[in-house]
Design a protein with these regions (language model features):
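Glycine-rich, charged/polar anion/phosphate-binding loops
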Residues: 31-36, 89, 123-128, 160-163
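A glycine-centered loop/beta-turn motif at secondary-structure junctions
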Residues: 165-195
Length: 211
């Protein structure tokens, strides 16, 4: 399964072990740059938008309208996608005053401080791309930018009682601020690849890979 992985200065936070596990369960990882490529690579079966610093490159990401359109069209066609933290921000309507992909509602804004910082346990309220209802995985949040809407498919719980809804998730999407390590629950990686196999959506088949 060909999984497009955003890798550039804006999207650079990945657990290498998590990428290795995706390879182990059948993924071919295809790097691309939302900053400089004009469209998604051809023939993708899934998409992984990791964390990073999209707020520092918001103007450049926004100016690359062809890539924004390519990503949105792929997601609207049902391409399975994981978007963590910075990747989630990229899918919203805007980062600050800079329009983004616009697949998810709401804008991202500078909170002026760390927002919901620390380790949490994510528990799914509904079946989704990565697990069934009740499935859980350790995760963490570390970000100074927040979003007007952050989703409610999962509940994030701190070790000492505080909890909140988070993450937009469907049968083909996980998009939210929490980062997780696939080895904390390898079934999440297996389920993601299964969705990619079942979907066999091929995004950007009429496009040329920018690399």
């Amino acid at each position: 399964m060909r999984i497009g992985v955003a890798r550039d200065n804006a999207f650079c936070f990945y657990y290498e072990d998590s990428l290795g596990l995706l390879r182990t369960v059948g993924a071919e990882l295809v790097p691309f740059s939302p900053l400089s490529d004009s469209a998604l690579p051809a023939g993708l079966d899934g998409l992984y938008l990791g964390g990073g610093y999209p707020e520092l490159y918001a103007a450049q990401l926004s100016e690359n309208r062809s890539m924004c359109s390519s990503v949105r069209a792929a997601l609207e066609a049902g391409l399975p996608c994981i978007a963590e933290c910075g990747g989630f921000m990229y899918l919203t309507e805007a980062i600050g005053e800079h329009p983004m992909v616009g697949f998810l509602p709401g804008r991202c804004f500078d909170a002026g401080k760390l927002a919901r910082f620390g380790y949490v346990t994510l528990t799914a309220e509904r079946d989704n791309l990565l697990c069934r209802a009740g499935g859980s995985i350790p995760a963490h949040e570390f970000h100074h930018w927040d979003a007007e809407q952050t989703g409610d498919t999962f509940t994030a719980a701190k070790p000492f009682g505080r909890s909140w809804p988070c993450v937009f998730a469907t049968d083909t999407l996980y998009a939210g601020y929490p980062h997780f390590h696939f080895y904390a629950n390898p079934s999440f990686a297996v389920r993601f690849l299964d969705a990619c196999r079942k979907g066999k959506h091929h995004a950007g088949t009429d496009q040329t890979d920018g690399h």
